[in-house]
């Protein structure tokens, strides 16, 4: 295997060598060679870049690999140039090949930078071997795996969990989502369209963001839409959840309304002869609390189900594009799901649910994620048929990746970053500044992680 890999690489560089023979006729291929042999780019060589360069060169001019010009027909200048090229290549390979006598026939790792971690490439290679099945099977398997760590994490998180520590996970989630969009999804859309970004892909990104916006807005409307007679004024010191947190203007209006209700209630109590108003008000408050709690729980479950469906769709679509992109999308979804599941845990525990009940509800939402993976598999499989329906699915298939990118952008900028903008008054100014610096570090860390995946 090792000899075959070397033969492939030497053949590639011999193809680069032939670009000097044909002069201006193969000027573009010569640019590939010069770019490839520059020290800055040589430090970024891996199997993917080698295969890409090989494909570009052969597509540029297939005759590069089948030239009839022999070594005797080359001029002294051409031979000198070839020697320098091969000398540079061999020197680079000698300095970067791993020294391992037992597994040298299977290991071929070239560092991206001088101080690059070889173990990271080994981990990536190991993960890719786990997804050696068909694209559809890989997508369903990855979707299932993304649901396991968050549920395990739920069991380990104590009920009194510091929200500032939770926001560190949220920051990693934000960085990973942006990394998946800008380092994986959008470059793939660009490359699959021949170095172009068609208007249909741009609108698909917009549609993806709008779908998540409509879902988010609809849930907010449904949560706050209840009979005004059932509205319950908050007690002093009672905290408001992030889901039902009103804006500043609405808070002022609510305060005035509550004061008016209090004055009216005092007047009613003075004029009444019995305790009937107190009893009625107590019943109304209990009904209001039960109605609001059930609404929050059910709508949160609905939101999670749709979100997991879109995650399954995105992961499987990425695997049908490329295994490496599928793995990076899986990591992005996984890093986002952990803080999201903790947030769901907080909502459900606050409404009286036990951890075991929370896990049952999360299993229900996991099924919707698997359903999304199955739908994506069906779309990509059926699109290969020559029927009009298959043609429609083929067009839909091309829009799934940019649609996913738009959804991830909405989640990152309007779903995740606003949580990081919240100020924790108990930490003080210095504490909030320190946590802000930590958020920046974790965002960059999450983004950089997707660069190496």
Curated annotation (Swiss-Prot):
Major location (coarse): endoplasmic reticulum
Gene Ontology MF term list: zinc ion transmembrane transporter activity
Entry keywords, A to Z: Endoplasmic reticulum, Membrane, Signal, Transmembrane, Transmembrane helix
GO cellular component term of the entry, any: endoplasmic reticulum
Bilayer disposition of the protein: Multi-pass membrane protein
InterPro entries linked: MFS_trans_sf, ZIP
Classification via Pfam families: Zip
Name of this protein: Uncharacterized zinc transporter P8A3.03
Lumenal-side positions: 24-137, 187-194, 380-399
Annotated source species: Schizosaccharomyces pombe (strain 972 / ATCC 24843) (Fission yeast)
Lineage per the UniProt record: Eukaryota, Fungi, Dikarya, Ascomycota, Taphrinomycotina
Signal peptide (UniProt feature, chain positions): 1-23
Tagged with keyword Electron transport: no
Transmembrane regions: 138-158, 166-186, 195-215, 359-379, 400-420, 433-453
Superkingdom of the organism of origin: Eukaryota
Location of this chain's protein in the cell: Endoplasmic reticulum membrane
Chain residue ranges for the region called Disordered: 229-278
Compositionally biased residues, Basic and acidic residues: 229-238, 256-278
């Amino acid at each position: 295997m090792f000899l075959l890999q070397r033969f492939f690489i030497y053949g590639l560089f011999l193809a680069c060598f032939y670009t000097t023979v044909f002069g201006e006729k193969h000027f573009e291929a010569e640019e590939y060679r010069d770019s490839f042999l520059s020290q800055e780019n040589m430090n970024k060589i891996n199997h993917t870049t080698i295969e890409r360069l090989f494909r570009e060169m052969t597509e540029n001019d297939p005759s590069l690999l089948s030239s009839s010009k022999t070594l005797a027909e080359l001029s002294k200048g051409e031979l000198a140039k070839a020697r320098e090229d091969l000398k540079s290549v061999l020197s680079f390979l000698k300095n970067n090949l791993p020294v391992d006598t037992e597994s040298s026939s299977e290991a071929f790792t070239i560092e991206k930078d001088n101080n690059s971690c070889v173990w990271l490439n080994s981990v990536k290679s190991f993960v890719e071997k786990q997804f050696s099945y068909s694209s559809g099977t890989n997508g369903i398997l990855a979707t299932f795996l993304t649901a396991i760590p968050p549920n395990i994490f739920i069991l380990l998180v104590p009920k009194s969990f510091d929200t500032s520590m939770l926001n560190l996970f949220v920051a990693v989630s934000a960085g990973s989502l942006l990394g998946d969009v800008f380092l994986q999804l959008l470059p793939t859309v660009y490359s699959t369209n021949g170095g172009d970004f068609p208007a249909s892909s741009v609108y698909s990104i917009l549609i993806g963001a709008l779908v998540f916006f409509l879902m988010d807005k609809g849930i907010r409307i449904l949560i706050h839409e209840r009979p005004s007679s059932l509205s319950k004024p908050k007690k002093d010191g009672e905290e408001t959840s992030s889901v039902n947190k009103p804006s500043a203007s609405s808070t002022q209006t609510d305060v005035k309304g509550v004061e008016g209700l209090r004055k009216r209630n005092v007047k009613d109590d003075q004029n009444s002869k019995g305790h009937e108003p107190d009893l009625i008000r107590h019943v109304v408050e209990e009904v209001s609390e039960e109605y609001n709690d059930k609404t929050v729980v059910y709508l949160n479950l609905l939101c999670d189900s749709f979100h997991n469906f879109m995650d399954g769709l995105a992961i499987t679509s990425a695997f049908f594009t490329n295994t490496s992109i599928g793995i990076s999308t899986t990591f992005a979804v996984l890093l986002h799901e952990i803080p999201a599941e903790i947030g769901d845990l907080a909502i459900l525990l606050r409404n009286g649910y036990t951890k075991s009940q929370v896990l049952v509800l999360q299993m229900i939402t996991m099924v919707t994620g698997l359903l999304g993976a199955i739908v994506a598999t069906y779309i990509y499989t059926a699109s290969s048929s020559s029927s009009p329906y298959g043609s429609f699915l083929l067009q839909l298939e091309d829009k799934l990746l940019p649609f996913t990118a738009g959804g991830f952008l909405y989640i990152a900028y309007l779903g995740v970053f606003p949580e990081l903008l919240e100020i924790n008054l108990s930490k003080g100014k210095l504490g909030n500044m320190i946590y802000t610096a930590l958020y920046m570090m974790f965002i960059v860390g999450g983004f950089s992680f997707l660069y190496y995946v």
